[in-house]
Design a protein with these regions (language model features):
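A short, charged, amphipathic alpha-helix used as a generic interaction element across diverse proteins
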Residues: 23-47
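Solvent-exposed serine/threonine-rich low-complexity stretches and specific carbohydrate-binding patches
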Residues: 22-25, 66-68
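Short aromatic-glycine-(Arg/Gly/Cys) micro-motifs in beta-strand/loop hairpins
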Residues: 1-16, 45
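Residues that cap or initiate secondary-structure elements
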Residues: 14-16, 27-29, 56
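N-terminal leader/targeting signatures
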Residues: 6, 29-32, 64
């Protein structure tokens, strides 16, 4: 099992539950995160966050945040 899991979390404006995409590779997670760095994302989301979970320590770390 990989040591890290990366998550892109989309906080929705409509009050529905957050959408979460999980990735095992940082490069793919960052690519997905960057795809939403555009003005149209502000119409659906209040925030998009890229985080990393360390399975050895159990710690979560926020790597990047976009706030609209």
């Amino acid at each position: 099992m990989e040591r890290y899991t990366y998550e892109v979390t989309f906080t929705r404006l409509d009050g529905q539950p957050d959408e979460i995409q999980q990735h095992t590779g940082e490069e793919l997670a960052r690519e997905c995160f960057r795809l939403f760095d555009e003005p149209d994302s502000a119409e659906m989301y209040s925030k998009i966050e890229l985080s990393r979970h360390d399975w050895e320590t159990g710690m979560d770390e926020i790597l990047e945040t976009m706030t609209f």
